[in-house]
Each structure stands twice: as C-alpha cells, then as structure tokens.
From Swiss-Prot:
UniProt keyword annotations, A-Z: Milk protein, Phosphoprotein, Secreted
Pfam families: Casein
Organism ancestry: Eukaryota, Metazoa, Chordata, Craniata, Vertebrata
Annotated gene: CSN2
Name the record gives this protein: Beta-casein
Function according to Swiss-Prot or TrEMBL: Important role in determination of the surface properties of the casein micelles.
Compartment(s) where it occurs, according to its Swiss-Prot or TrEMBL record: Secreted
Region (Disordered): 1-51
Tissue expression profile of the protein: Mammary gland specific. Secreted in milk.
Residues with the Phosphothreonine modification: T12
Family: Belongs to the beta-casein family.
Comp. bias intervals (Basic and acidic residues): 28-51
C-alpha cells in the first residue's frame, strides 16, 4: 500500500514537473511530500494503538461483578431435578455411665407400692338413726351435757349423723374435782326451792369444765315449834 502511494505521488510529481515550471514544481513537490509524511505518521499511530489494545484485551480476563453488600447464601441450592432422600430419625443412645446412675437410684430409692383403698360398708337407709336430743333410746349422752353445744351444730348435720350399732363409750371424765356441797347436819322440814337448787348436779359449761351452781347460797330458816 505504501509503495502504491509512493508510485502515485511520484507520477503526480512528474506530471506537475513536466507541465509547470521548475520553481512551482519544487514547491508543490515539497508540499505533497509533507502531506504524505503526515498521513503516514497518523496511520502508523493508529495501527500501533489498535495493536496495543489487542494485546491488553488478550491478557486481561473479565472478572465477575462483586457486590459489597451482597450476603452469602446460607444453604445449598438443590436443583429441581434431584430428589432429596429422607434421612432416618436418629435415636439417642444412653451412655453406660448414665445407665449405671439410673440403676443406682432405683436400688437406693425403691418405688413405693400403692395400697388399694378398701371400700367402706354402706349402711342402708332403713338402718340409719336420726339424732334426736329428746329421744332417750337413741341418745346415749345426758341431755345437760349436750345442751350447751346444740346451738353450734347445724340442723343438716343433726339429720345426717349416724349412730353406730356398737355401744358408745362414755366420754372421759375430767380430773377436776366437783365443787364441795354443804352438808346439812340435821333434817330439814319444809325446804324451800332455793335451797333445793343447791343439791342439783353441777352443770357443764362451754369450756368443758364442771361449774358450780350459779345461784347464791341462801340461808335456810326453819320454823321453831314450841
């Protein structure tokens, strides 16, 4: 290509030199030579740049784009065509040391056997007895001992209480000695009612102790017959 351009330029120079005078031909030749030299330099620079870019593109490989805020995938991506095999459940095995400790606990602390509850015999309705304070056959306790507690026992309990068929044991007597009663040295005639109350049995108070009679002692005057 360069050779062809040189030939064309030489032909043009010859034609100009033949047609024009020598002075003008020399100027035109110099001008043409300058233009050719500039074109040649420019083309050489372009070729060098293209070759340099080709060399750089061969050595430099494309790198993947890295995102600074991208988080890694926490699990493995399984393709859709692959079936996941179901794993059998893992059963934990007890170590021999743990088995020995459990056996030692069983020997030290044996399990208690639960005793069955015995069913109590059911008393038929015909044999039930209703507690009646006025009935002397069903009531084994004296009336004057139960009267202080009658206002504390509700009526529903009095109707549901059952007396056993066995004889009721008498309540233990307290060790407190009764109040000494005055002894009359001689027989009396026409004893008034107030003096007769002194000889009654002591009453049981709410505290469970024997209390003496609350009536004051009244002197007894017997009429003297002359």
């Amino acid at each position: 290509r360069e050779k062809e351009e040189l030939n064309v330029s030489s032909e043009t120079v010859e034609s100009l030199s033949s047609n024009e005078p020598d002075s003008s031909s020399e100027e035109s030749i110099t001008h043409i030579n300058k233009e050719k030299s500039q074109k040649f330099k420019h083309e050489g620079q372009q070729q060098r740049e293209v070759e340099h870019q080709d060399k750089i593109s061969r050595f430099v490989q494309p790198q993947p784009v890295v995102y600074p805020y991208a988080e890694p995938v926490p699990y493995a991506v399984v393709p859709q065509n692959i079936l996941v095999l179901a794993q059998p459940p893992i059963v934990p095995f007890l170590q021999p040391e743990i088995m020995e400790v459990s056996q030692a606990k069983e020997t030290i602390l044996p399990k208690r056997k639960v005793m069955p509850f015995l069913k109590s015999p059911i008393v038929p309705f015909s044999e039930r007895q209703i507690l009646n304070p006025t009935n002397g056959e069903n009531l084994r306790l004296p009336v004057h001992l139960i009267q202080p507690f009658m206002h504390q026992v509700p009526q529903s309990l009095l109707q549901t209480l059952m007396l056993p068929s066995q004889p009721v044991l008498s309540p233990p007597q307290s060790k407190v000695a009764p109040f000494p009663q005055p002894v009359v040295p001689y027989p009396q005639r026409d004893t008034p009612v107030q003096a007769f109350l002194l000889y009654q049995d002591p009453q049981l108070g709410l505290t469970g102790e024997f209390d003496p009679a609350t009536q004051p002692i009244v002197p007894v005057h017997n009429p003297v017959i002359v």
